Amino acid sequence: MKKIAVITGASSGMGKRFAETVDRYGTFDEVWVIARHEAQLEALRATVPFSVRVLALDLTDRGSFDVYAAALAETPVEVGLLMNCSGYGKFSAVLDTPLAVNLNMTDLNCQAVVAMCQITAPYMPRGSQIINIASVAAFQPIPYIDIYGATKAFVLSFSRALNRELKSRGIGVMAVCPFWTKTAFFDRAIKSDETPIVKKYAAMYDPDNIVARTWRDAKRGKDVCKYGFVARVQAGLTKLLPHSVVMDVWMKQQDLH
């Protein structure tokens, strides 16, 4: 029986960082990396010291889940780790964003997470773990990042509930809620031909520090991982203040009306 790890969104950003360092978490016979861009996944495979299987799949296409399910079924495997890192956001008013983009975002950020968890969990033995990338945006509504924030709130809530459901099977689930992080996320989130909506960042963290904290908290069996003083303060304040006040502060900080 081959022991594997499965990582989505592995072609760039946080997903790539996790794929490059997964051997810090544990030892696997093979690491399956999933993303749309096959060339980038192949480049990743050439740089890591462990066996990698490339699955070039678009997780907004529901047919991709059939391909993934078939790949699991055709080879005797146990999945020791599932990491759902696929996702993106847009800094834009809802009505200024094409409907297709907003629906695609919800498909990738939410439906793909549900599908990957449900398909993979039957192959996960006791002691295995699911890690879903959420965001500190999950803790409050954020105007002009509406869809992204709402999808990450879904991921956080889903992950915590699933963690409780799978406890009897010995499978842990953790949601990672980072603050602003220096990745390619911003290349897709910001329209290059317009004045950025988000102008001020309270902090910007190094992705390597997020990765290290994630591996540490996963080994400790936590259900939520938050890195950085600012992230913890923001998450804490959303429990104390009305969300209307939190949104007012955000709008004022970004000079929005």
Q: Language-model segments: which ranges?
A:
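Conserved NAD(P)H cofactor-binding loop of Rossmann-fold oxidoreductase domains
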Residues: 85-90
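Active-site helix of classical SDR
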Residues: 117, 151
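C-terminal helical subdomain
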Residues: 175, 197-232
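Conserved glycine-rich Rossmann-like NAD(P)H-binding loop of the short-chain dehydrogenase/reductase
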Residues: 26-43
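Substrate-binding pocket helix/loop in short-chain dehydrogenase/reductase
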Residues: 93-95, 101-104
